[in-house]
């Protein structure tokens, strides 16, 4: 009886891990487990475009038509159609950060009125709730994130520091 129970538990675990791999979430260039958990919880502060936040974390950005967004630095990809917005993180420690989006959009990171070069990006269209993740080296000065080209009015966004071994620092709202 006990052996059957253990066998059943193992089968469920194998099936669950297979489902995650099948839906594409396990196929990003780096792990997005923390973002999956955060986005799956569904509780986010709604942030209007042009808002300032005190620090990194996860939030839901309420976008507006791109034509109405006033970008600090001209977008690298132009002013695509769709929706966009900007948000400034007022205090952020220096380091490598992973910024993950729930939907398709472009993103620019800006510090000291200059675009921060993107170090890496990965995207998938087969991971429910997560579309893309990018990494930047950030200085310890305010960080403005510019978004555009989204076809949805609300975008879940996480800004999490990457640890030295490229794991994500733990963050809870």
Language-model segments: which ranges?
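Short, intrinsically disordered, low-complexity segments enriched in Ser/Thr and Pro
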Residues: 15-16, 129
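Acidic, Ser/Thr/Pro
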Residues: 22-173
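Bacterial N-terminal signal peptides that target proteins for export
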Residues: 1-7
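Bacterial Sec-dependent signal peptides at the C-terminal "C-region" and cleavage site
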Residues: 16-22
């Amino acid at each position: 009886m006990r052996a059957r129970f253990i066998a059943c538990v193992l089968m469920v675990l194998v099936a669950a891990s297979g489902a995650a791999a099948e839906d594409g979430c396990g196929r990003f260039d780096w792990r997005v487990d923390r973002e999956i958990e955060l986005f799956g919880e569904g509780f986010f502060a709604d942030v209007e475009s042009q808002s300032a936040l005190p620090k990194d974390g996860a939030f839901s950005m309420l976008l507006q038509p791109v034509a109405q967004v006033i970008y600090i630095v001209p977008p690298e990809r132009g002013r695509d159609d769709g929706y966009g917005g900007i948000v400034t993180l007022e205090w952020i420690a220096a380091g490598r950060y992973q910024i993950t989006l729930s939907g398709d959009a472009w993103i620019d990171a800006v510090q000291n009125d200059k675009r921060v070069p993107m170090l890496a990006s990965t995207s998938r269209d087969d991971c429910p709730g997560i579309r893309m993740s990018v990494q930047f080296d950030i200085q310890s000065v305010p960080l403005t994130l510019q978004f555009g080209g989204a076809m949805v009015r609300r975008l879940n966004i996480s800004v999490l520091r990457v640890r030295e071994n490229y794991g994500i620092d733990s963050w809870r709202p």
